[in-house]
Curated annotation (Swiss-Prot):
PSII is composed of 1 copy each of membrane proteins PsbA, PsbB, PsbC, PsbD, PsbE, PsbF, PsbH, PsbI, PsbJ, PsbK, PsbL, PsbM, PsbT, PsbX, PsbY, PsbZ, Psb30/Ycf12, at least 3 peripheral proteins of the oxygen-evolving complex and a large number of cofactors. It forms dimeric complexes. GO terms for cellular component: chloroplast thylakoid membrane; photosystem II reaction center. It comes from the Eukaryota. Coiled coil: none annotated. The lineage of its organism: Eukaryota, Viridiplantae, Streptophyta, Zygnematophyceae, Zygnematophycidae. Keywords: Chloroplast, Membrane, Photosynthesis, Photosystem II, Plastid, Reaction center, Thylakoid, Transmembrane, Transmembrane helix. This is Photosystem II reaction center protein J. The gene is psbJ.
């Protein structure tokens, strides 16, 4: 297996890690905003 399956120079696992961190950050900010009372505007 070569790097044909990957998107360009970026490994697929790296994209998965970044997407996971971004998703956790968005969910964390949403729950933090809802807990502090600022998430009610969303």
């Amino acid at each position: 297996m070569s790097n044909v399956g990957t998107t360009g120079r970026i490994p697929l696992w790296f994209i998965g890690v970044i997407a996971g961190i971004a998703a956790l950050s968005i969910v964390g900010l949403f729950f933090y905003g809802a807990y502090s009372g600022l998430g009610s505007s969303l």
